[in-house]
Structure formats: structure tokens, C-alpha cells
Amino acid sequence: MPELPEVEAARRAIEENCLGKKIKRVIIADDNKVIHGISPSDFQTSILGKTIISARRKGKNLWLELDSPPFPSFQFGMAGAIYIKGVAVTKYKRSAVKDSEEWPSKYSKFFVELDDGLELSFTDKRRFAKVRLLANPTSVSPISELGPDALLEPMTVDEFAESLAKKKITIKPLLLDQGYISGIGNWIADEVLYQARIHPLQTASSLSKEQCEALHTSIKEVIEKAVEVDADSSQFPSYWIFHNREKKPGKAFVDGKKIDFITAGGRTTAYVPELQKLYGKDAEKAAKVRPAKRGVKPKEDDGDGEEDEQETEKEDESAKSKKGQKPRGGRGKKPASKTKTEESDDDGDDSEAEEEVVKPKGRGTKPAIKRKSEEKATSQAGKKPKGRKS
């Protein structure tokens, strides 16, 4: 899912190409799962003729500041992306719409043409993004509930160490908590923990002063570098775990050291056991539960399925009310089943396959049944190889 660097790259592209220009044409998709709380026609009327003054971001959220409110706000979800026609903008790899596709893309949820002819589109292939029209985006959820932005509002080393000392949860889920620090997602959390040589399941309050300092430094350096290159992963340093974290178990190495995969905070997590070791009570606890974990580990998805949807929902303003939304919860289970059958394919093709399951709402039953049978067959056929992960 797009994280702080990808959203910041989109913000900068808008700032460089769209400021001071008037919106002369608007097309809003008729998709009430993505377009939140307003009809397409009302959305269009509200921003037509307005001038874009600035593009702002907090965490993984972006909004356009116009010459008068309300303002369009974008929560990128699993696969949201900003496109500006004729302008190169870095996108999360599973967000990318092919250049050969129609313009605006069939996945476009928000499209505007500016008075100089420039065209901007927000697309979402997976339909887990949220596009809102808000009078003051920072005063309402999800932005009002976010913690300090990891790039713009970093804690000092002392503040960071003091806050970690009060947290009795494991460090990886804490870093993913957008209410604690906003902008860090799964790949950044894995990267900064690897750089700081901290095990993802180490309890935050048990970290030494030196570890807190190392983690503070790695967060700063990883995010600043990713932003510096506009989130272009081909320019990330070769020693980053990022380049190998999606390879198959047993084939993933960084600097000659084996990468292993566990689940931390419900997320598939890449780490290097040789360098990131548990210690103290966490090590004792892990030794007791490790056999059980190994038994369920192959069932985890590849890090881009249901768990990303759950992270998006946690950031959503309806986090409390969603407990009663049974249809949405039901849809969340189907992509998870599908992902299990395709967990060995990590090249991004799973995005389009999942998209076919989500999109045709009226045809969900038969494909789901078919995928469950395929999952069972795949699971039975692959038990022994997966058992060798450890």
C-alpha cells in the first residue's frame, strides 16, 4: 500500500504542476465505496471553477487546498494513485495503471481538467481508498486522529525514547499505528527495524537507550532517502532489505544473510534473524510459542491482501462504526482466501486478480467457492515445501 514517500511524491507533483490553476472540468466516479459522504454531482459542483492553492499531506493522507472550502481529500488505501497527464509521478507498484490504457483510466475516481489543459486523476484499482470533500480536513477523522507526521513532525530522540518506554506492545505494530506516528507502513517498518537491528516482536518498552537512538535514526534516514528519490524504489540503497523482502522464503537474502518471514501485528514481516534477535522476556516467550507459530505461518498472506485492507480501515473515520458493517467484513474475507492461493506470486499480478473478485458485487459467490476449492488443493499440494520455511 502507498506509504508516506509515495504520497509525498504525489503531493510534490501537484505542487509543481497544478498550483494557481483553475478547475474547469470535473468527473467524479459513481462509486460510493470510494467517494465518501457526497454524491458525484454535488462533489463536482462544489469544486468546479475553484483554483488550486496548495497540496498538503499528513501521513498517508493528501488534500488539495482550493481558494475556498470545501477541499478534496484523499486516503490512498491499498492502491490509490495520483496521475497527471504527461507528468511522471511515482506510484506504488500495485497502483500502477498501464500507459497503454485509456485516459482517464477506467479506475479513475476523481478527475479534473485545469484551465491550461492539464489533467489530473486519482485512481484506485482495488477500491479501498476514500475520497472526501471536507471543509477542514485536519479537524475530522482520519487526519485529526493521526499522530505526528514521520517526516514533517519528528519527535526528538529523547521524546521518542520516553514514549517507547511507556509502550508495552511489540515494536512493529506500534510503528504501524498511525495514531502514534503517521506515514509508516509495512515496508518502512520492516526497513527501519532492520537498519536498527531490532526484532519486530521485541516489546517497545524493553528497548535500550541505544536501540531507541538507532531506531530514531533509521526512521529519519529511510524516510528522507525515500522522499529524496520521489519513492522510486530503483534508487533505494542496494543494502536495504526492501529489495528482497518479497522474494520467496528460502530465496530471500540481504548482504548474504537470510531473510525470514513472521507475522507481527497481523502483518507479514521480513527480518534477518542473524541480526535482529529477541532478548529478555520476549525471547523466553517466543521460545515457548514458536512451534505453534510455525504451524500457522504458511497461512499468512503476502502482505498485500486482507491485512492491507485492515490497515486502511484502521485509519478510516468509521473505525468504530465499521464493527457493525457485516457486508464489508464479508468482502474482506474473500480477498484473503484468494491471496492464500497466490501467496507465492509477489510480482504485483495479484492486484488485478483480486480486483476481479471485488468489482462484480453480484457475482461474488461462485468465484469465492471456486477459489476455496483451489486454495484447498494448493494447500495440500504445498504442505511439505512450506513446512521447510523455518
UniProtKB/Swiss-Prot annotation:
It catalyses: Hydrolysis of DNA containing ring-opened 7-methylguanine residues, releasing 2,6-diamino-4-hydroxy-5-(N-methyl)formamidopyrimidine; 2'-deoxyribonucleotide-(2'-deoxyribose 5'-phosphate)-2'-deoxyribonucleotide-DNA = a 3'-end 2'-deoxyribonucleotide-(2,3-dehydro-2,3-deoxyribose 5'-phosphate)-DNA + a 5'-end 5'-phospho-2'-deoxyribonucleoside-DNA + H(+). The gene is FPG1. It is found in: Nucleus. Disruption phenotype: No visible phenotype under normal growth conditions or UV-A irradiation stress. Belongs to the FPG family. This is Formamidopyrimidine-DNA glycosylase. The keyword Ligase does not apply. The active site is at 2 (schiff-base intermediate with dna), 3 (proton donor), 60 (proton donor). PANTHER family: FORMAMIDOPYRIMIDINE-DNA GLYCOSYLASE. Disulfide bonds: none annotated. CDD domains: PF_Nei_N.
